[in-house]
């Protein structure tokens, strides 16, 4: 058996999320596995670096799979992509060792959240942008966000459905920047809880509108009470930028540190 790592890009708008959930609806996982199976002429199961929810997009999701069939990387890339819908594409393929694991070998994961901050909702690229009509203070949001850095208990920002054994995560970097009418929030952590990014964004938006002071974010973190935090932000503006791996795995630069 040969193990391969793939970099996968997808528009999550038409999917119920990454994970295959029986017959409930289309998933990125099932769609990718079906295309890979056609190339391998055998069933294929993929393991991803980070599962995404319904409507969340993937810029460079990393997966691994095992196959008894040997194909050159170009064949896996082109053969699989031609069998995928236009919303999913395989960007790269790297043969790797059986010790590599898309999830457990990753040392960090990155997300980006983008929203349009103007009076009128977006018509173009609306599936990739959230929207907030009230003026936002991006600098206040950025300062408040820095209070979340480090290893902390993020219970205030986890969903009620989160199945993680504990809520401690290391938030390694977070920034809030304005580019004309677009606010961009970038987050990196060793791992994330269910809805963690969207819940953080929802609370930062309340700081941005002036509804809450910057110090409120630190109070939420210390309080560990989800019911006291802001609402969950829309999935529409969220992109899983991708995981990061140690250089020893010899993966493309965009996912290596």
From Swiss-Prot:
<dbReference type="InterPro" id="IPR020095">
    <property type="entry name" value="PsdUridine_synth_TruA_C"/>
</dbReference>
<comment type="similarity">
    <text>Belongs to the tRNA pseudouridine synthase TruA family.</text>
</comment>
<dbReference type="GO" id="GO:0031119">
    <property type="term" value="P:tRNA pseudouridine synthesis"/>
</dbReference>
<dbReference type="GO" id="GO:0160147">
    <property type="term" value="F:tRNA pseudouridine(38-40) synthase activity"/>
</dbReference>
<dbReference type="GO" id="GO:0003723">
    <property type="term" value="F:RNA binding"/>
</dbReference>
<keyword id="KW-0819">tRNA processing</keyword>
<protein>
    <recommendedName>
        <fullName>tRNA pseudouridine synthase A</fullName>
        <ecNumber>5.4.99.12</ecNumber>
    </recommendedName>
</protein>
<feature type="active site" description="Nucleophile">
    <location>
        <position position="53"/>
    </location>
</feature>
<dbReference type="InterPro" id="IPR020097">
    <property type="entry name" value="PsdUridine_synth_TruA_a/b_dom"/>
</dbReference>
<comment type="function">
    <text>Formation of pseudouridine at positions 38, 39 and 40 in the anticodon stem and loop of transfer RNAs.</text>
</comment>
<comment type="subunit">
    <text>Homodimer.</text>
</comment>
<dbReference type="InterPro" id="IPR020103">
    <property type="entry name" value="PsdUridine_synth_cat_dom_sf"/>
</dbReference>
<feature type="binding site">
    <location>
        <position position="111"/>
    </location>
    <ligand>
        <name>substrate</name>
    </ligand>
</feature>
<dbReference type="InterPro" id="IPR020094">
    <property type="entry name" value="TruA/RsuA/RluB/E/F_N"/>
</dbReference>
<dbReference type="InterPro" id="IPR001406">
    <property type="entry name" value="PsdUridine_synth_TruA"/>
</dbReference>
<keyword id="KW-0413">Isomerase</keyword>
<dbReference type="Pfam" id="PF01416">
    <property type="entry name" value="PseudoU_synth_1"/>
</dbReference>
């Amino acid at each position: 058996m040969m193990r391969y790592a793939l970099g996968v890009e997808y528009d999550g708008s038409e999917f119920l999320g990454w994970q295959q959930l029986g017959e409930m609806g289309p998933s990125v996982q099932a769609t990718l596995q079906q295309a890979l199976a056609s190339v391998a002429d055998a069933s294929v199961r993929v393991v991803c670096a980070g599962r995404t929810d319904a409507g969340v997009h993937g810029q460079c999701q990393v997966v691994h799979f095992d196959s008894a069939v040997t194909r050159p990387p170009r064949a896996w890339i082109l053969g699989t992509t031609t069998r995928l819908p236009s919303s999913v594409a395989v960007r790269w393929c790297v043969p790797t060792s059986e010790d590599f694991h898309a999830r457990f070998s990753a040392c960090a994961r990155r997300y980006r959240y983008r929203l349009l901050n103007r009076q009128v909702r977006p018509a173009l690229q609306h599936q990739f942008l959230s929207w907030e009509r009230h003026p936002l203070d991006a600098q206040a949001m950025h300062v408040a966000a820095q209070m979340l850095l480090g290893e902390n208990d993020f219970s205030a920002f986890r969903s009620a459905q989160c199945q993680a054994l504990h809520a401690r995560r290391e938030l390694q970097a977070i920034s809030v920047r304005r580019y004309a009418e677009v606010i961009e929030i970038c987050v990196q952590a060793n791992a994330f809880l269910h809805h963690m990014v969207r819940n953080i964004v929802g609370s930062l938006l309340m700081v941005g509108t002036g509804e809450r002071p910057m110090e409120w974010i630190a109070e939420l973190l210390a309080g560990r009470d989800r019911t006291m935090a802001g609402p969950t932000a829309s999935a529409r503006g969220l992109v899983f930028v991708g995981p990061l791996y140690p250089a020893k795995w010899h993966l493309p630069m965009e996912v290596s540190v």
